[in-house]
UniProtKB/Swiss-Prot annotation:
Protein name: Flap endonuclease 1
Organism: Komagataella phaffii (strain GS115 / ATCC 20864)
Listed Pfam families: XPG_I (PF00867), XPG_N (PF00752)
GO CC terms in record: mitochondrion; nucleolus; nucleoplasm
An example Gene Ontology molecular-function term: DNA binding
EC number: 3.1.-.-
Keyword Secreted: no
Cofactor or coenzyme needed: Mg(2+)
Length: 373
């Protein structure tokens, strides 16, 4: 879910941290992508005209496979080398948030069934999107597809966005790509948003520079993490009555959650309520010391797609068009070869042009000589 209100807060205090650009501007970059986020995104967005998910003749959902296949080809076509990272086991602290999500899905499912009786197709589709959940089988199917496409993936021991950030910090990739703003809490040098959004939506890829975020907020990592916990994260609830503006003000004034709590408890006029048995310190530790595979132990290799195996998997097993799968495999193969070209900024240091020498007041410009007739 990310951090509530963080994007707007950074935009206000660190506007220079944002850079919007077309996908092609990341030519030659390796990017670690939150695959678990992609799975939800594809299952929600990749639909038929009637709003139903794509499915094969057996009724098995294939929206996620189509999403991974074509969005990956699109990125590689722009010279980007994607590496996908899948979620592992969720932290114990996240149990409360996951339970809330389950209840929301159950409520949406009830509303969806009611809508089938009285609602329009648009109404039914809206509630169907809210009931989406990713199964273990869909995870495994996506991994199998990526393997056949020659695209590397990593199974994170815990949170996918933390592992993406670790790969970026360790120099294995340029940036972490996720819609979750809490990826910044794991110190990714760069966070890319809208990387896997449908091309039809025409959303620019947003690059967020971690160093510039810290510079604009005038914070170090511990204060930033405490700010994010106050704003609201997946690991614990926050202080009632504290919104983004107040949270920022409190951290700037007191420097840590401990001192914020102390100030609130010592102020009899305060209307803010500290949650009972608030595990903010445990949440902080999850951000400061996430469970990840060290980047040095991750070997990422991009290979040629196995076209025949892809056809067998996508066409014979999942009902896709053979011609489209072969065309996609061909495009992927050509793009991977093109993508081996490096970025020019890896080889050259761009220097500013020297300023033109200022002409002194007493210096006379030489006039062009007149031609003799």
């Amino acid at each position: 879910m990310g951090i509530k209100g963080l994007n707007a807060l950074i935009n206000e205090h660190s506007p220079k941290a944002f850079r919007n650009g077309e996908m092609k501007t990341f030519f030659g970059r390796k990017v670690a992508i939150d695959a678990s986020m992609c799975l939800y995104q594809f299952l929600i967005a990749v639909r038929q005209q009637d709003g139903q998910q794509l499915a094969n003749e057996e009724g098995e959902t294939t929206s996620h496979l189509m999403g991974f296949f074509y969005r990956t080809i699109r990125m590689v076509g722009y010279g980007i080398k994607p590496c996908y990272v899948f979620d592992g086991k969720p932290p114990v602290l996240k149990g409360g948030e996951l339970e809330k999500r389950l209840k929301r899905r159950e409520e949406a499912e009830k509303q969806r069934l009611d809508m089938k009786e009285t609602g329009t197709l648009a109404d039914i589709a809206k509630f169907e999107r809210r009931t989406v959940r990713v199964t273990r089988e869909q995870n495994d199917q996506a991994k199998k597809l990526l393997e056949l496409m020659g695209i590397p993936y990593v199974d994170a021991p815990c949170e996918a966005e933390a592992q993406c950030a670790e790969l970026a910090k360790g120099g294995k990739v340029y940036a972490a790509a996720s819609e979750d703003m809490d990826t910044l809490c794991y110190e990714t040098p760069y966070l890319l948003r809208h990387m896997t959004t449908a091309e039809a939506r025409k959303l620019p890829v947003t690059e967020i520079d971690y160093a510039k975020v810290m510079e604009g907020l005038e914070m170090e990592l511990p204060q930033f993490i405490d700010l994010c916990i106050l704003l609201g994260c997946d690991y614990c609830e926050t202080i009632k009555g504290v919104g983004p503006v107040t949270a920022f003000k409190l951290i700037k004034e007191h420097g840590s959650i401990e001192k914020v709590v102390e100030a609130i408890e010592n102020n009899p006029k305060s209307k803010q309520k500290i949650p009972e048995n608030w595990p903010y310190n445990e949440a902080r530790e999850l951000f400061l010391h996430p469970e990840v595979i060290p980047a040095s132990e991750c070997e990422l290799e991009w290979k040629e797609p196995d076209e025949e195996a892809l056809v067998d998997y996508m066409v014979r097993q999942h009902g896709f068009s053979e011609q489209r799968i072969r065309d996609g495999a061909s495009k992927l193969r050509k793009s991977l070869k093109t993508g081996t070209q490096g970025r020019l900024d890896k080889f050259f240091v761009v220097k500013k042009r020297p300023a033109e020498e200022k002409k002194g007041k007493n210096t006379k410009e030489e006039k062009p000589k007149k031609k003799r007739k």
